[in-house]
């Protein structure tokens, strides 16, 4: 008779679980990649954007300066962007700020994904896409910080609007729209588009219609009573201007992407789960790779050279401007203008001006301001 010691107990099989813990780790890894990528790109490649935008505006700590922004819807959003942009004289600060904003955007839209489509395989894909698209937009020197803050605010308000809550909670959220309109300006229309699309797919048209009723009343009151702003300001300010982009359709495609963002999430959920799981596995990596390729494709060394020249020119470093232009031979009109003025300041214009390119005749010696501005805008500073 065999003893109890001879009886072998069945061993438990070890299984690798892919539960909430692994998803949480995956999420934090993606956030770390977004932050690191943005910090690296804007610190080492697109840091000239910080110099340009910091010099473009003068922030003044005064009630008069603040009142100029507080007197119109969306003004405080631009004011906040201007305030934060004053630290752009330090490239590390600028890169850290941009990276933080992009990471916050990804976090907010990830939360939206989890509410709209809980358990979806694409919960990270669309959040990374939203952050990456705005990262690409920021490579334009005239695309400012408050533009990304506006999309962030629209996402936060939408997140609050679709959060689980009773009838009273939703009425309260709808009633807060005038305040949101005052803070975010025309980014309210992005939010209205998002909430309308979500209401349509979820068959909650009354909820979306309520926002449009409040929006219409708010618009009339702001136009006729409170702010007396022109329709163009109420309907578009402070959205990014299309004039700063070679292909103006890029801006409208950006707006449409965020407006139909909830619809994209819901449509993707109709895929077969086994197929979507396979597709979603590498989708985040593909988005990151595409973003990196497009940012480096849009990068121009001529832009870097031009703004380094401008930085030395504003610092009255005439020798530095002369040496840099003669070394790099930049053919941009503004670069040649800085070079010739520096030669004139050193008394060497007649003897040394042909040591560097002179492609524009007298234009590179005395350039009208409007031509100087248009030249800078057209010298590959814009997303093509």
Please place each PLM-identified region on the residue numbering:
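Single conserved hydrophobic/aromatic residue that forms the stacking wall/gate
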Residues: 377-384
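Membrane-embedded alpha-helical segments of integral membrane proteins
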Residues: 205-272
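Membrane-interface coil-to-helix junctions
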Residues: 40-96, 101
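Internal/C-terminal transmembrane anchor helices
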Residues: 276-300
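Membrane-interface segments at or immediately adjacent to transmembrane helices
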Residues: 296-370
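Hydrophobic cores of alpha-helical transmembrane segments in multi-pass inner/ER membrane proteins
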Residues: 2-3, 100-107, 151-163, 188-199, ...
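Membrane-interface micro-motifs in multi-pass membrane enzymes
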Residues: 55, 70-74, 94, 98, ...
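Transmembrane helices and adjacent periplasmic/lumenal helix-loop junctions
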Residues: 141-145, 163-205, 216-226
């Amino acid at each position: 008779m065999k003893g109890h010691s001879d009886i072998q107990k069945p061993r438990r099989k070890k299984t690798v679980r892919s539960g909430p813990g692994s998803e949480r780790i995956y999420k934090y890894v993606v956030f770390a990649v977004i932050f690191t990528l943005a910090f690296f790109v804007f610190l080492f490649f697109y840091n000239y954007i910080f110099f340009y935008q910091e010099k473009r505006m003068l922030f003044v700590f005064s009630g008069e300066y603040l009142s100029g922004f507080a007197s119109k819807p969306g003004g405080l959003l631009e004011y906040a962007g201007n305030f934060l942009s004053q630290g752009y004289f330090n490239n590390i600060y600028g890169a850290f700020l941009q990276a933080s904003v992009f990471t916050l955007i990804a976090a907010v839209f990830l939360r939206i994904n989890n509410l709209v489509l809980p358990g979806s395989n694409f919960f990270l894909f669309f959040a990374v896409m939203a952050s990456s698209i705005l990262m690409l937009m920021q490579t334009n020197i005239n695309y400012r910080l408050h533009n990304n803050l506006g999309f962030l605010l629209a996402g936060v308000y939408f997140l609050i609007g679709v959060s689980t809550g009773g009838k009273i909670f939703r009425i309260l959220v709808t009633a807060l729209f005038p305040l949101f309109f005052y803070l975010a300006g025309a980014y309210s229309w992005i939010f209205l588009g998002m909430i309308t699309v979500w209401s349509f797919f979820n068959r909650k048209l009354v909820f979306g219609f309520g926002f449009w009723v409040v929006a219409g009343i708010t618009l009339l009151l702001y136009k006729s009573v409170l702010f007396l702003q022109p329709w163009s300001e109420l309907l578009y300010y402070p959205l990014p201007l299309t004039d700063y982009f070679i292909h103006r359709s890029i801006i409208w495609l950006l707006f449409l992407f965020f407006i139909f963002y909830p619809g994209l999430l819901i449509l993707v959920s109709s895929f077969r789960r086994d197929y979507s799981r396979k597709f979603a596995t590498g989708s985040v990596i593909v988005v990151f790779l595409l973003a990196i390729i497009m940012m480096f494709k849009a990068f121009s060394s001529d832009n870097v050279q031009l703004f380094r020249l401008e930085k030395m020119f504003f610092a009255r470093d005439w020798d530095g401007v002369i040496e840099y232009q003669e070394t790099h031979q930049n053919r941009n009109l503004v670069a040649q203008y800085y070079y010739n003025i520096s030669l004139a300041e050193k008394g060497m214009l007649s003897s040394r001006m042909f040591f560097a390119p002179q492609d524009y005749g007298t234009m590179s010696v005395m350039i009208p301001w409007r031509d100087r501005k248009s030249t800078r805008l057209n010298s590959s500073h814009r997303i093509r």
